[in-house]
Amino acid sequence: MSASSQSRPTTIACLLGPTASGKTAAALALAARRPIEIVSVDSALVYRDMDIGTAKPSREERASVPHHLIDIIDPADAYSAAEFRADTLRLIGEIVARGRTPLLAGGTMLYYKALTQGLNDLPGADPEVRAALDADAARDGWPALHARLAQVDPDTAARLAPNDSQRIQRALEIFMLSGQPMSALLAAPRRTDDAAAAYRFVPVALEPSDRAVLHTRIAQRFDAMLDAGFIDEVERLRRRDDLHPDLPSMRCVGYRQAWEYLDGDTDYRTMRDKGIFATRQLCKRQITWLRAMPERIVVDCIAPDATARALDALERVLDGRTPD
C-alpha cells in the first residue's frame, strides 16, 4: 500500500464559479486572512497579452498574493487539460512545501474534472497531423472533414457542428494517431495516479439564485471591457500575423466576436450583442457543470454579502469543518 493511501489526504479548497460571479473578490478576501497562493483554473488566463478580454487579475491584485498559471504561454500555442493537471499537482506540492496554502480558483470545469477525476488515455497533439488536416480543410472545407469524421466516429460527429474546426480536427487527429474513435476512448475508465490521491479537493461553488442578475453583470462587464480598450487589444494580436481565429486562444469568448468585427463580418453593436450572448452561454454551461457536483458547498454569488459567505465557506474547508 502506498504512503498516500495510508495517510489522510491534504484538503485543497477550490473556489469555482461562472464568469462574473465574484471569484477574484473572494480569493483576495481569503488572502487577507491567510498565507495563500492562488492557482488559476482558467483556460483563458494562461495566455500572455490577453488581459482585457479575459478579465485577468490586475497587476496590483497579483502583487498582493502570488498567482500561478497566468501568462504562461503564447497565444499561438495550446495548453491542454493534461498539462494543467500536471502543473497544478506540481504547484500544490511546492506551495504546501513552502508552508503556505494553495487555493484553486476559476471556472474552467474541464480542467477541474481532469484534475480531480483523472485523464483518458488520449494521444497528444501532433503538429504534422494537424498541418495535414489544416491543408485538407483549406482545400475542401471543414464540413467535408466533418463528413469524414462521421464515417470513423459517428458519435462524436453527431454532437459537433460542421464548422467546429477545433473539435473536428482534434477528433480526427485522435483517430489518425490511435486508430480508435475519440468517443470510445472517452468512454474508457479514467486513469488516476497517487499524486492526485494525496489530496481531497473540496469545491466551493459560487452560483446565482437569480440568473438574470448575473446576466446583467455579464453585460456590464463586457461593456467595461470594451471601454477599457478590448478591441485595441485584439487588433494588436491580429497584427502579429501568426494568429488566426481557429486557435484555442482566439476562440475564447469575446475574442472570436471581436475578430469577426475587425474582419468586417459584423458591425459594432452586433459584435457586442454576440459577445454578451456567448458569455451568457458559457455561464450556463459552467453552472450546469457545478450542479453536477453533489459534494460542492454552494454560495449565492448575487447575495449582498456573497464575498463574506464565500470567505466563511473557504475557511471552514481549510479548518476541516466540513463533512468528509
Swiss-Prot record:
Annotated segments matching region Interaction with substrate tRNA: 42-45, 166-170, 251-256, 284-291
EC number(s) stated in the UniProt entry for this protein: 2.5.1.75
Enzyme type, top EC level: transferase
Protein's name according to its UniProt entry: tRNA dimethylallyltransferase
Xref: Gene3D superfamilies: 1.10.20.140, P-loop containing nucleotide triphosphate hydrolases (3.40.50.300)
GO terms for biological process, alphabetical: tRNA modification
Domain of life: Bacteria
InterPro entries, per database record: Dimethylallyltransferase, IPT, P-loop_NTPase
Record carries keyword Acetylation: no
Signal peptide: none
Catalyzed chemical reaction(s): adenosine(37) in tRNA + dimethylallyl diphosphate = N(6)-dimethylallyladenosine(37) in tRNA + diphosphate
Pfam families in UniProt: IPPT
Cofactor(s) needed by this chain: Mg(2+)
Binding site for ATP: G17, P18, T19, A20, S21, G22, K23, T24
Sites where the protein binds substrate: T19, A20, S21, G22, K23, T24
Subunit description: Monomer.
GO molecular function, one term: ATP binding
Assigned keywords, A-Z: ATP-binding, Magnesium, Nucleotide-binding, Transferase, tRNA processing
Gene: miaA
